[in-house]
């Protein structure tokens, strides 16, 4: 009898196993989380059954899956993996919508989905660009993995050095730009060799992993001065928050570094009240340079970023962000004299805490910043050439309020304290001479107020004013501005004008090079832009600009030149003086298409002239970063759910060789006219291929990139050696990167 019962049980189980399994259907829509546009050619996978579907032209998909709790995963190249949990009833149909976030960040439900394609960081700024995470990933470069390299391809941005992150906008130098992180001006965001005049062998790279960035914005001129103390463009980084959905891990290997990003919910997962994000990056750039550069300079870096975010209440949020990094440059000992630069060390740390309180009609934000930096440059013999230490502490408070539907006001105040010490010495014969030695501290305080008023639906006015005080010189400054936008159908006309001022730094005021009564630098911006929308996904923009500058700094007598037929060497003791007056004028043309399912990119051309006059000697010359013609082109096309191709092209007429140089019969000599000789024009085309492979909860992305596809020989300025008898300047230009293939990969768990 037991045997008979066992046989009957086995037969019943066999019959049950042959019964059809209950199934249901999932009908869904996949959207771009930023624009709300349907996404075509997206792979949607049911993790349990391995059933998959690909979205059509309308972004929709359908699949038949076993009933019960199902976990879907949407994957397409250029977007973060997106999980979706659904419950499928037997014989039922479930409707789902899956929004995808471009780049590396996960979709946040708090983000408002709109139909607008083009984002704005400052609604009234005539010329601006915002790069999201997806474009940063494609433009940063596999070789360098640097978000500032992504900015270099934006309209109006000029750069002529493959090895440096710094760039110029409308002739303005990097030191005159606002470089911000999470709303604070942050000067320590570069891995670089500091305080070295001979930058021929040096390079730089941003001290932040591109994978942790939410976006980066560029405002070329005429922007709202929430921070102030800069006369040029504004570049702002925003670090994304970690995933509140589940723990995630990303491991990447690029052409120069390896990195890991871990993130996940903070607190109970079901509550979704907070998140954490940790990133670490280690370079092996020195191995690459060893193969590409003849003198085998070694440059390495490491950095880490942390961001914690927590909702204290439904209306209050706290954030804490930390960046730390260090870099090391080592020149080959066999090619150096005992007094030459052999070792350059640089280390920085920045911490930012923020609190945000959102009310029905108002927003209140408070923030704290602390930053430290130290650097040291040593000779082969172990003598310090440069030794510097800097500290920064800041606090700021911002508030905004919607008074009426047509009137919005905002204001804020900040106090920043700085401490800086610097010692510099240079070899003189067999000994060293102290060139500069100072230590000081100062406080900068400022406040601003701004409004946005729309008297009619088609017109918006945005006036504002900022007041600043700098205790180092005892100077105060008032900086007003006004923006206006007029919309007529698909056409927008934006104009802006304002006064932008920058106080002198410690080196300009104290120490051997400083002048105690040096004035602040001032610039008046005048911008006018006309933008024409072409449907929902394209636009054309033309901008004309004029930046009038006065009281800009110069070290007269610091450069070697020919005077009355005699070679006059530059003085190492020359002091800073505010004696330059000049202008930067030009026009920028820009076409952009932003389409999630087709070709995206832009074409831009900028023509500019940047010239100065010394108000004491009446000497007139082109600015160091004057570039007459600038072409920047970028294109991206998604071939399938797994494959995309992109390319970027930068062409520039290039900058002057800074100093008094001239050319005669193919040779270069010290001359009588400053910035009369220019670096040869540059052109560089880079191509990139992305390919993804998806397995359930994991994805592998392979990157392949070729830098300088056309193998064009480009050059940068190199401080030359000068023959005192013939005045010849030898090795004035230095060759940059040839054609370089590179590859990388990214694991996502």
Question: Language-model features: where?
Answer:
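C-terminal beta-signal and adjacent terminal beta-strands/loops
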Residues: 642, 651-665, 690-749
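Surface-exposed extracellular loop regions of Gram-negative outer-membrane beta-barrel proteins
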Residues: 185, 190, 196, 421-428, ...
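Gram-negative outer-membrane beta-barrel transporters
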Residues: 456-461, 546-548, 570-661
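Structural signature of Gram-negative outer-membrane beta-barrels, strongest in the C-terminal barrel
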Residues: 321-323, 400-410, 414, 435-550, ...
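Periplasmic N-terminal accessory/gating domains of Gram-negative outer-membrane beta-barrel systems
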Residues: 80, 87-95, 109-224, 234-241, ...
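Transmembrane beta-barrel wall of Gram-negative outer-membrane proteins
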Residues: 254-282, 294-328, 342-365, 401-407, ...
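Periplasm-facing N-terminal accessory domains of Gram-negative outer-membrane beta-barrel systems
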Residues: 10-116, 121-122, 453, 486
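Outer membrane beta-barrel strand-and-loop segments of large Gram-negative receptors
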Residues: 392-398, 436-448, 519, 525, ...
